[in-house]
């Protein structure tokens, strides 16, 4: 009888801690929504608030910029290094966003940064990963 009580107690504890762990994972995923990821990207690029940017970028993310006829490519580490150099620097631009495509697995958001004399259009692709919505690709064009 004592063994049966011990086994029952063990199963109850296992179920309790398993449910608590699942709730923690869900809460973290709710933080990584499309809106959170895009807002974090904009805050880093426009306002120099870089503290949360790494969390919303996928490890294999690619960043591509077309400047005139020149194509520049960067990975996550390189883009984070570049953004860190502009920490707390406020860009002199106005920003607008528009969702170009969205479904349960993928979202593409256009982020326009309008400066005096030119506009930088960023096409931000986000994927719904097991860790929440992550930026997987950013393609930037200067007009």
Feature-to-residue mapping (PLM):
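Short beta-strand segments enriched in hydrophobic/aromatic residues
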Residues: 57, 113-115, 139
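Surface-exposed, charged secondary-structure patches
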Residues: 29, 77-118
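Hydrophobic alpha-helical targeting segments used for export or membrane insertion
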Residues: 9-13
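Short, low-complexity N-terminal intrinsically disordered segments enriched in polar/charged residues
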Residues: 3-8, 19-47
